[in-house]
Amino acid sequence: MNKPTILRLIKYLSISFLSLVIAAIVLGGGVFFYYVSKAPSLSESKLVATTSSKIYDNKNQLIADLGSERRVNAQANDIPTDLVKAIVSIEDHRFFDHRGIDTIRILGAFLRNLQSNSLQGGSALTQQLIKLTYFSTSTSDQTISRKAQEAWLAIQLEQKATKQEILTYYINKVYMSNGNYGMQTAAQNYYGKDLNNLSLPQLALLAGMPQAPNQYDPYSHPEAAQDRRNLVLSEMKNQGYISAEQYEKAVNTPITDGLQSLKSASNYPAYMDNYLKEVINQVEEETGYNLLTTGMDVYTNVDQEAQKHLWDIYNTDEYVAYPDDELQVASTIVDVSNGKVIAQLGARHQSSNVSFGINQAVETNRDWGSTMKPITDYAPALEYGVYESTATIVHDEPYNYPGTNTPVYNWDRGYFGNITLQYALQQSRNVPAVETLNKVGLNRAKTFLNGLGIDYPSIHYSNAISSNTTESDKKYGASSEKMAAAYAAFANGGTYYKPMYIHKVVFSDGSEKEFSNVGTRAMKETTAYMMTDMMKTVLSYGTGRNAYLAWLPQAGKTGTSNYTDEEIENHIKTSQFVAPDELFAGYTRKYSMAVWTGYSNRLTPLVGNGLTVAAKVYRSMMTYLSEGSNPEDWNIPEGLYRNGEFVFKNGARSTWSSPAPQQPPSTESSSSSSDSSTSQSSSTTPSTNNSTTTNPNNNTQQSNTTPDQQNQNPQPAQP
């Protein structure tokens, strides 16, 4: 190829490339202007507006008007320079250099997204203000069209307002936790001072809160708040806004420095605080909007009377005799037909001064013990055909965790030998549970749990009798919310419904979004019925006698977690039976409820009557919900048949010779309720060799046992 030909080829390619670039620019520009033509109009009234959201219960009665409680706007000349430096350091280094969008930041975010295959933001401070004012923050709404509109409005705002005015809008717009809107409001209520009278570390704390105000709340999460404050200070030092000496002094200042006691900021009943926190979270999850900064009407699923009654059960001795005021309770109640959360409460004696603090009802940081057995072991075994009846014989005998030399112990260190599946669950024996999980297989059990809304990063044989996991963060493991929803699938015949706190949102422009819960099939109807039939006996003759009600068809399971040998030796130092957590999960045809009890400090043990509180809270609440409602029992579905006390799948051979029916619980001792812990005679629940129980080491509590009762011998419940 000669030189002139090469030159012509280069010229042709150059022109073609340039044409493509121009075409791309024109096309991109056309698309951009199409998107921005649909953007909302920039309005100062929206930038400075005091928004509020009204929250309603399931009867459309107003519960709360959020956003109207506390808002004191700062004036531009009252904003200290150190606060401005702190905000731009942590949020937008080049705020004073760009005109609404930071192209360098956008390019950096783009490159990081390519490298990590994830989505990272490149929004400048002005764009954040626009987003807070006009748009959803949901990841699913981070579309090209939305980003184009956001950038366009940011550029427009930069042309119409000064940097100082934009900062003032932002400072007054952001939510600052505990019912405080705007940084001036937070300064007054956290420190009793105006912004211009705060110290450097105090201003750094406020500057760092808007990205996750409840997570960085210095009252509820002081460690996280301190880490965030110190990150802000580090950025200020890196940007040259403060000296190394100022930095060292500030980071060594206690996070509590200057904090005053919170005053109640809420205009809603204290018993609604935990529930409203979950409403806020679910609204943002489902719509992308934060109702604390975006005005809307939210219609929830809470039964306010039930919520109030649950509060009364927690905070009076009228229903349950609590051993002390420090023992804590967390529970969730769902409608089994649709997953609607009708009531939820995360603690007793909650401070009225903290809004939207920790809600233990949704936390997964405590162990749910043997309440996991029905959903991890026995239901999967029935679902996948490992067992064909509730009379299937399982083995309660010396057994090691599969693949190890570590023995599985029952709570009493004894063994019942060959027993029925029903009796193993009724008496909460650990060995048959672990053996069953081994037969099911870890992968199939994990899949089954996922179908019930419970996930683990990985599952282990110890999960046969506990929910312990080292990775929690609310995603993994169990909580009262997750367990109530999971057990609801037993109650309704096998369908899992995601817990729902909201059913409709009406936005400020009049548009509506409704939320229906279709549900997904988690197990066969036959599996759900067989599990229910077995768990009925847990309340009648097993470990759940404190929840028993003679007139109410219901089923459930107890749970108890354990201390390690090291914890007992170093911290507990008692020969009494103790536990860090006591649980109960149960249900009727209408409602499912899960209850956690324990102390905030896990090393404070439950002992004596404290170990009966979970079941008694459940019984009190189910009594309230079910009295006068003519509660119905479950009907045996097609595909099953009954032989005496047991249920068999069609086609399964019934070789079991049924004994005489179990004696129903006595109604003559109802005055003592189920508070009695006196051992009575054993029920007649079958075991092929109950008389040969062995107990090699009855006095030692081991870390891997999961006891659910204090009495060695099974006894009928008292109504």
UniProtKB/Swiss-Prot annotation:
Segments for region (Transpeptidase): 297-611
Q: Where is this region: Transglycosylase?
A: 62-223
Major place of localization?
A: secreted
| Pathway in which the depicted protein is active | Cell wall biogenesis; peptidoglycan biosynthesis
Substrates-to-products reaction catalysed: [GlcNAc-(1->4)-Mur2Ac(oyl-L-Ala-gamma-D-Glu-L-Lys-D-Ala-D-Ala)](n)-di-trans,octa-cis-undecaprenyl diphosphate + beta-D-GlcNAc-(1->4)-Mur2Ac(oyl-L-Ala-gamma-D-Glu-L-Lys-D-Ala-D-Ala)-di-trans,octa-cis-undecaprenyl diphosphate = [GlcNAc-(1->4)-Mur2Ac(oyl-L-Ala-gamma-D-Glu-L-Lys-D-Ala-D-Ala)](n+1)-di-trans,octa-cis-undecaprenyl diphosphate + di-trans,octa-cis-undecaprenyl diphosphate + H(+); Preferential cleavage: (Ac)2-L-Lys-D-Ala-|-D-Ala. Also transpeptidation of peptidyl-alanyl moieties that are N-acyl substituents of D-alanine
Gene Ontology MF, one: penicillin binding
UniProt EC number: 2.4.99.28, 3.4.16.4
In terms of domain of life, where is this protein from? Bacteria
Per the UniProt entry, what are the Gene Ontology biological process annotations, in alphabetical order? cell wall organization; peptidoglycan biosynthetic process; proteolysis; regulation of cell shape; response to antibiotic
Query: What GO cellular component entries does it have?
Result: extracellular region; outer membrane-bounded periplasmic space
Which residue windows does the record flag with biased composition (Low complexity)? 654-719
Its localization reads: Secreted
Cite the active-site annotation. 91 (proton donor), 370 (acyl-ester intermediate)
This protein's record includes keyword Transferase: yes
Q: Whom does it interact with, and what assembly results?
A: Interacts with MreC in the elongasome.
State what this protein does. Cell wall formation.
Q: State the protein's name.
A: Penicillin-binding protein 1A
| Biological classification of the source | Bacteria, Bacillati, Bacillota, Bacilli, Lactobacillales
